[in-house]
From Swiss-Prot:
It comes from the Eukaryota. Pfam families: Lipase_3. SUPFAM superfamilies: alpha/beta-Hydrolases (SSF53474). Its EC number is 3.1.1.-. GO terms for molecular function: hydrolase activity. Belongs to the 'GDSL' lipolytic enzyme family. It is an enzyme of class 3 (hydrolase). The keyword Hydrolase applies. Keywords: Hydrolase, Lipid degradation, Lipid metabolism. It comes from Arabidopsis thaliana (Mouse-ear cress). This is GDSL esterase/lipase At4g10955. GO terms for biological process: lipid catabolic process. InterPro entries: AB_hydrolase_fold, Fungal_lipase-type.
Length: 350
């Protein structure tokens, strides 16, 4: 049986992490990414009928770090594995190889992205379309995920739970995290190459043109949002109802970790999304961006739900190393490579 190099932990996994410091960002990012890759490989194990300790390639992606996959999330239509729950259990005799245990997770809920194989591609693309149309919350995959996360958070609290996902799976992790964060629990969230549904303005080389387009977009988006809000306000006044709390601002104390590559047009717009807020503050019209940043122009015109990709605060990590092509820029393996250069910034919505 032909084995893909990307599935083989001994060839492409983070083998250098023989001891873990849970306070180290590179270690945390690498472990979270490896667990997500474990879900990808679990699905490919299923499709290729690689079963048992001799053939299955997925277990080592988690067991190398002393995690065990205790539950698989299975799609109700095609039986594909789209996510799972890992439990961390470090053997007592190995406790000396791990530092900062207070920052370790007890459970990690991980989600894969699209698998371009015949057994799962149609169902995955269906969910990709749900992301585009801001309808991921209506899917049975989300119902399975959010119920599982709620149960775990109720049992052990939010601080012991991590969410992690790549591409489509990053959208699922962010949506699940948003939903839980609104209940007052702030789980760690590792979103690798999360889709940002917007024109790829970040690709424009001329900074003045790029900034001008962003300002114009912000003004239009903020104007439409305020007009919509005014209409709703008058409607509520007619019924003597109080204005609802701002759901976007309620998430401002939650800092999901976003990992983006400028060469990946599906997620690179996050760089401009957060930097543009600072620029708008500098020129004195930050109030416009505080309204615009909560809304998607396309979403408002289509009348959709709140977009998954719009986040008030974040810890944004950018891979500054060049990628040879889109496939590499969008891949999960880049996030545990030692030779890549990363830049991390914290953005807080105020």
């Amino acid at each position: 049986m032909m084995i893909s190099e990307r599935d083989d932990f001994s060839l492409t996994g983070p083998l250098h992490l023989t001891s873990i410091d849970w306070a180290n960002e590179h270690h945390r990012r690498s472990v979270a990414g490896s667990l997500v890759q474990g879900i990808y490989v679990a699905e490919r194990d299923r499709q290729l009928q690689r079963e048992g300790p001799e053939l299955a390639l997925s277990p080592i992606w988690s067991e190398f770090f002393h995690f065990r996959l205790i539950r698989k999330f299975v799609d109700d239509a095609d039986n594909s594995i789209f996510g799972g729950i890992y439990e961390y259990k470090l053997p007592q005799q190995l406790s000396q190889t791990v530092k900062s245990m207070e920052f370790s997770p007890r459970f990690v809920i991980a989600f894969r992205g699209t698998v371009t194989k015949v057994d799962s591609i149609s169902r995955d693309i269906e969910h990709d379309i749900h992301v585009i149309r801001n309808g991921l919350h209506t899917t049975t995959r989300f119902e399975i995920a959010i119920q599982a996360v709620r149960n775990i958070v109720a049992s052990v609290g939010g601080s012991s739970v991590w969410l992690a996902g790549h591409s489509l799976g990053a959208s699922m992790a962010l949506l699940t995290g948003k939903t839980i964060a609104r209940t007052g629990f702030f789980p760690e969230c590792f979103a690798f190459n999360p889709p940002f549904l917007s024109a790829p303005i970040e690709k424009i080389k001329d900074k003045r043109i790029k900034h001008g387009i962003r300002i114009a977009g912000s003004v239009i988006t903020a104007g439409l949002a305020l007009a919509k809000k005014a209409t709703q306000h008058y409607s509520q006044n007619d019924r003597a109802l109080p204005a609802p709390p701002d759901p976007f601002e309620a998430l401002s104390d939650w800092f999901p970790r976003l990992y983006v590559n400028p060469g990946d047009h599906l997620c690179s717009e996050y760089v401009g999304y957060f930097e543009h807020r600072n620029k708008m503050e500098e020129i004195g019209i930050g109030f416009v961006e505080r309204v615009a940043t909560q809304h998607s122009l396309g979403g408002m015109l289509l009348g959709g739900q709140e977009p998954v990709h719009l986040i008030p605060s974040s810890v944004l990590t950018v891979n500054l190393s060049s990628s040879r092509d889109f496939k590499q820029a969008h891949g999960i393996h880049q996030w545990w490579r030692e030779d890549n250069k990363f830049e991390t910034k914290v953005y807080q919505y105020k």
